Amino acid sequence: MKRSIFFDLDGTLWDAINQIKESWNLTMERLDQPFSFSFDMIKSIMGLTPLETLPITFPGLEEEKAMKLFQECVKDEIKFLSKKPGTLYPNEEEVLASLAKKYQLYVVSNSDVGYVENYLTSCHMEKYFKGHVCAGDTKLAKWQNILYLKEKEGIDEVIYVGDTLKDKIESSKANVQFIHASYGFGVIENDEFKITNLLELPQLVDKLFNGD
C-alpha cells in the first residue's frame, strides 16, 4: 500500500512572511505604485490562491491590473527568496529525513509557480520530497490538487499536514486525513489531530496510518 504525506508550505514547512513583505514593498517602489504591505496583511493571505489574494492586496483595482501587479510581486519574490529564504521550523530536516524513509512526501500549496521550488532548492529539501503541485501550476483548488496528485502518483492513502482552517476544509473535501500544524499561522477550534511542533509528527502519522 502506497502511503504519502502531503504538506502545506507557508506556516507548515517555513515562515517567509517578513521576506515576502520586504520583497513586495520593494516591487511597489520599483513600479511607483501606491500600494504597501504590512506583516499582518501578508500573513492574512498565506494559504490563499493568487486570485483570492487580489482584493486584499490591491483593493479597488480591477482584476486584470491587480493580477499584473501580483505577478510582478511574485517574479521579484522568487529572486528575493532564492537569496534570503524563509525560516524553517525547528527540527524540520531531521523530521523530514525520518518520514521520507517510510512514506512518500509531497508539497501541495496554493502558491504561484516557482514558490515551492524556491523552498525546495534554497533550503536544500529536494531529496526528501517526491514531488509537488501548486495552484499556479493547475489553476485548481487545493482539494482538487490533492486528488490530482493522489491519482497521478497512484497513492492509496494520504495524510495532509497544514496550519489553517482552509487546509482542514480542503482536506475534508478531498476525503483525506488532516493534521493541524498548530505552530503555524492558523487557529482551528476542535482540531481532532494536531501537532505543536514537527517532532510530534512521525508518531502521530504512524498512529493514523496504522489505525491505532
Positions of PLM-derived features:
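Short, acidic loop-to-helix structural element flanking the phosphoryl-transfer center
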Residues: 79-107, 117, 143
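N-terminal helical cap/lid subdomain that shapes the substrate entry/recognition surface
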Residues: 2-90
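Conserved SAM-binding loop
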Residues: 6, 13, 105, 160, ...
